[in-house]
C-alpha cells in the first residue's frame, strides 16, 4: 500500500517579530491577493490554511474592506480555512482566561465568514499547557496540532496520540515533528528535492501511526507557491511508492481517528530535546510581562465582575468595549510578542498597546463604579464611600482607599449609622482641576484634600458596602510609629544590616535566613535564551550596609530598605569582572 503525503498549503503569519505589524501588513496585502487569485482561478487547488488566526483577516480588511465578500465566499466553500484563534497565542505566559477569550473572539470573528477550523492549531507556541485539552473541549474542538515541547520522554515515540487533561478532557494530537516549514519553497530541481525529502520523510514515517503524513507547504510570511502542481508531479516521479496530493489538516485527523491503538499522554509539553521551547523568555522584558499580568488581572478580577454587578442593577454591559480591550492585549499574546523576543521597536509597539488597553480598562472601571454609586438611594445623599468586593465570598479584610473631599475633618458611618473605625495614613492637597475639569469650569477653584485611609470591615460577596462621610470639627490622625521588627499573628520579620530579612514563620515554627539576598549577574544570550558568562564572579548584597526603616500602625506594617550596589556597567565590564557603576 502506498503511503499518503498530505501537502497542506499554509502560511505562518507573525504579525510582528523583528519587523513591526505595519511592515508585515504590506506583505500581507500582497499575499492575500495572490492566495485568493489562486483559489478563485484554480479549482484544482483545493485549500489554503490561514495560520489558525483571524487577526490576519482583520489586518487585511482594514486596508481592503471591499474584499470581505471574496473571503466570505472562499471560506463558505471550505477552501480558505480560517480560525479558530484570534491570534497565535502563547500558552505558558498569558493567563488561562486570555486563552479562552482568544478562542472565543476568534470563533466569533469566524462566524462572520463561515466555518472555522476545528483544530487547536498552535504550530509555533513555545510549550503547551496541560489544560489545553480542557479549554479546547469547552469549544467543542477535539483536535490539537503543535510543534514544540514533545519527545519520547513524555511517554510516546509517536507523533500522534490522545492528550488528556486532569478533568478527563481529551483531544487527538498531531505533532509537527519537524515544524511547520519543512515544505516551504519546495524546489523543482530533482537533486535538491530529493536531498530535502530524503532527510524529512523517514522522520515523518517513524513517528506516524498510520500511512498518512503531513508535509506543510508554507513558512513565515511566505507567499503562496504557485508552481506547486509541477513540484507534486516531480515528487511523484521521485517517490513512486508514495501518493502526494494537496490536502487540509482535518483530512489527516479523519485518518487518525480510524486508529484505535494510540497512546494517551497527560501533562504539559516543555521538552526541548528536538526543538527549542525558549523557557528563558519567561523572564525577558519584565516591563511587558508585568504590564500584561496587571491588565489581565484588572479585566478578569475587577472590570468584568463590576460590569456584571452593574448589569444586575439595570445598567448596560458593554460587550463591545470589553471585546476591544481583550483584542488589544491579545495582539500582544502572540508567542513572539509576549515572549518579548522581538526587536526594540516592536517592544515599544507592544507597550503602547498595553497603554491603550489599560486606559480603556481604568476608565470603564471608573465609569461602572460611578454609575453604581450615583444610583444609590437618596438616603445616601451625603458624600459616599463605597467598598466593592468582587470575589464570590464575603471578605473581612483591611481596606486601603482614598477619600477626596474639601472637609478638614470627617467621620465615616455605614447605612445603619455605625461609626467606622479608620486611620489616616497620608494626606495631601490637590488642585480641583486635577480631579475633574468640570469642577473648575463652574468657578470652583478651592483645593481638595486627598486622604489615604485604612479600615477593616466585612464586605459581602460579589457586592459592595456603602458608607457616608460626615464633616466634623476635628479627627484623630494617627501616624505610623517606628519599630524594630514586624510582629503579627503569622510572622516575626527582622531586617539584617545588609538589607536581607530574617523571617520566623509561627505556623511552621521555622526560621528563614537571608530572604531578599540579591544576585547580580550577566546575560550574554539573545532575545530568546539566557546565557551566563563563563567564569563570571557574581555580585551579592551580603556585604553592604543598607538603610532600613520599619513602621507600623493599627492596620499594617511597612518596611523600606535602600542600598547601593556596585556592579559592572556593561557586558564587557562583566567579562573583565570590573564593577564600575552603581544601582540603587
Show where each model-derived region lies.
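Catalytic-domain carbohydrate-binding cleft regions of carbohydrate-active enzymes
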Residues: 1-384, 416, 420, 457, ...
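Catalytic and substrate-binding regions of extracellular carbohydrate-active enzymes
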Residues: 319-323, 331-584
Amino acid at each position: 500500500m502506498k503511503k499518503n503525503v498530505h501537502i497542506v498549503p499554509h502560511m505562518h503569519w507573525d504579525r510582528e517579530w523583528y519587523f513591526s505589524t505595519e511592515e508585515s501588513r504590506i506583505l500581507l496585502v500582497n499575499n492575500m491577493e495572490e492566495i485568493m487569485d489562486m483559489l478563485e482561478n484554480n479549482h484544482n487547488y483545493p485549500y489554503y490554511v490561514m495560520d489558525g488566526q483571524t487577526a490576519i483577516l482583520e489586518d487585511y480588511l482594514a486596508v481592503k474592506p471591499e474584499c470581505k465578500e471574496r473571503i466570505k465566499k472562499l471560506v463558505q466553500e471550505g477552501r480558505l480555512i480560517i480560525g479558530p484563534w484570534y491570534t497565535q497565542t502563547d500558552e505558558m505566559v498569558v493567563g488561562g482566561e486570555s486563552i479562552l477569550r482568544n478562542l472565543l473572539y476568534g470563533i466569533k470573528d469566524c462566524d462572520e465568514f463561515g466555518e472555522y477550523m476545528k483544530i487547536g492549531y498552535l504550530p509555533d507556541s513555545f510549550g503547551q499547557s496541560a489544560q489545553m485539552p480542557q479549554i479546547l473541549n469547552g469549544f467543542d474542538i477535539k483536535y490539537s496540532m503543535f510543534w514544540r515541547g514533545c519527545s519520547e520522554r513524555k511517554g510516546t515515540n509517536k507523533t500522534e496520540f490522545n492528550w488528556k487533561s486532569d478533568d478527563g478532557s481529551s483531544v487527538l494530537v498531531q505533532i509537527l515533528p519537524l515544524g511547520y516549514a519543512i515544505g516551504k519553497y519546495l524546489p523543482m530541481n530533482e537533486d535538491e528535492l530529493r536531498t530535502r525529502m530524503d532527510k524529512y520523510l523517514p522522520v515523518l514515517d517513524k513517528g506516524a501511526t498510520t500511512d498518512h503524513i503531513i508535509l506543510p507547504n508554507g513558512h513565515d510570511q511566505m507567499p503562496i507557491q504557485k508552481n506547486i502542481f509541477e513540484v507534486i508531479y516531480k515528487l511523484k516521479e521521485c517517490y513512486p511508492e508514495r501518493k502526494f496530493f494537496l490536502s487540509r489538516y482535518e483530512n489527516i485527523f479523519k485518518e487518525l481517528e480510524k486508529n484505535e491503538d494510540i497512546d494517551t499522554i497527560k501533562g504539559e509539553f516543555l521538552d526541548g530535546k528536538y526543538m527549542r521551547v525558549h523557557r528563558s523568555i519567561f523572564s525577558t522584558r519584565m516591563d511587558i510581562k508585568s504590564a500584561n499580568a496587571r491588565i489581565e488581572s484588572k479585566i478578569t478580577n475587577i472590570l468584568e465582575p463590576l460590569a456584571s454587578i452593574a448589569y444586575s442593577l439595570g445598567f448596560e454591559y458593554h460587550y463591545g468595549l470589553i471585546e476591544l480591550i481583550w483584542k488589544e492585549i491579545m495582539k500582544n499574546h502572540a508567542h513572539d510578542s509576549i515572549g518579548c523576543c522581538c526587536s526594540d521597536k516592536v517592544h515599544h509597539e507592544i507597550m503602547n498597546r498595553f497603554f491603550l488597553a489599560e486606559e480603556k480598562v481604568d476608565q470603564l472601571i471608573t465609569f461602572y463604579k460611578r454609575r453604581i454609586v450615583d444610583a444609590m438611594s437618596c438616603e445616601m445623599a451625603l458624600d459616599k464611600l463605597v467598598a466593592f468586593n468582587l470575589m464570590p465570598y464575603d471578605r473581612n479584610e483591611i481596606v486601603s482607599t482614598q477619600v477626596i473631599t474639601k472637609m478638614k475633618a470627617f467621620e465615616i458611618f455605614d447605612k445603619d449609622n455605625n461609626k467606622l473605625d479608620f486611620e489616616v495614613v497620608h494626606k495631601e492637597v490637590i488642585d480641583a482641576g486635577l480631579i475633574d475639569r468640570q469642577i473648575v469650569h463652574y468657578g470652583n477653584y478651592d483645593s481638595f484634600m486627598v486622604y489615604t485611609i485604612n479600615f477593616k470591615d466585612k464586605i459581602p460577596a460579589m457586592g459592595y458596602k456603602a458608607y457616608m462621610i460626615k464633616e466634623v470639627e476635628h479627627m484623630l490622625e494617627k501616624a505610623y510609629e517606628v519599630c524594630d521588627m514586624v510582629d503579627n499573628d503569622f510572622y516575626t520579620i527582622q531586617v539584617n544590616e545588609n538589607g536581607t530579612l530574617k523571617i520566623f514563620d509561627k505556623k511552621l515554627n521555622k526560621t528563614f535566613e537571608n530572604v531578599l539576598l540579591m544576585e547580580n549577574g550577566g546575560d550574554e544570550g539573545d532575545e530568546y535564551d539566557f546565557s551566563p558568562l563563563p567564569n563570571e564572579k557574581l555580585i551579592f548584597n551580603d556585604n553592604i550596609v543598607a538603610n532600613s526603616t520599619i513602621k507600623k500602625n493599627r492596620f499594617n506594617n511597612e518596611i523600606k530598605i535602600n542600598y547601593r550596589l556596585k556592579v559592572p556597567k556593561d557586558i564587557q565590564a562583566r567579562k573583565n569582572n570590573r564593577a564600575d557603576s552603581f544601582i540603587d
